[in-house]
Amino acid sequence: FHFAGHAHAFGALSEADALRHRQVNFEATRALAEAAGEAGVARFVSLSSVKAMGEPQDACIDEDWPVPPESAYGQAKRAAEDALLAAGERYGMHVVSLRLAMVYGAGGRGNLERMASLVRRGVFPPLPETGNRRSMAHVADVVAAMRLVAADARAAGRSYIVAHPQTHSGRGLYDALRAAFGLAQVRWSVPRGVLTALARLGDGIEALAGRRVPLDSEALDRLLGS
């Protein structure tokens, strides 16, 4: 099972960042797959990302989605999948790539965990319902998928999306987190226009300070528009 990788970074990437994605997420995976094949490893399961495909916008997609990835991260992940498939064919190795949606679970340090921390403290704004949808996968389901594709010969040479069938809007996540923490339901929301203005203010602060702030235009788009 190959877990190692350079974490997805949002926003504009420098040339050094893009090179890092290629070196770690693609070239290192390719080298590891070749070494595994040379050593006679029978099965190799690699954790990829749904970002290895182009953005679906409002479409419900499967593994055959033809749109190529746009980001340096996604391109490196897709190249790693192709390299793994080539190694599998060359060495007769059982290879599978799992394209993970946003993963959550105990000990996580991603966007959902940061959102949960702010909701629990009562400082996360009640989002408006925009009808956006996000796919997610619990870490236990990811582990189950890894074990399944490693053991089933039918999975060899394939890439699979790993995501729960139920999707969530930003507001739906907010309400679910409040319920999980035993907090009262909030029946109002901050208007999208107000959040947009605050996000643009965050953009300006980032430009001056040279570091990310909790709310900028990109973060808002992920909450309301993805």
Question: In which residue ranges do the predicted regions lie?
Answer:
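Flexible, glycine-rich beta-alpha linker
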Residues: M53-G54, M93-R114
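Active-site Tyr-X1-5-Lys
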Residues: E55, P68-V96
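Substrate-positioning beta->alpha
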Residues: G108-R114, P128-A151, G157-I161
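Conserved cofactor-binding/catalytic machinery of classical short-chain dehydrogenase/reductase
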Residues: A28-A31, R43, W65, A79-A80, ...
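Glycine-rich NAD(P)-binding loop of the Rossmann-fold in SDR/ketoreductase-type enzymes
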Residues: R20-A31, S71, Q75-A76, A137
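Mid/C-terminal beta-alpha module of Rossmann-like enzyme folds, strongest
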Residues: L148-L215
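NAD(P)H-binding glycine-rich loop region in Rossmannoid oxidoreductase-like domains
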Residues: F1-V24
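Conserved Rossmann-fold NAD(P)-dependent oxidoreductase catalytic core, especially the SDR/UDP-sugar
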Residues: H2, R30-A72
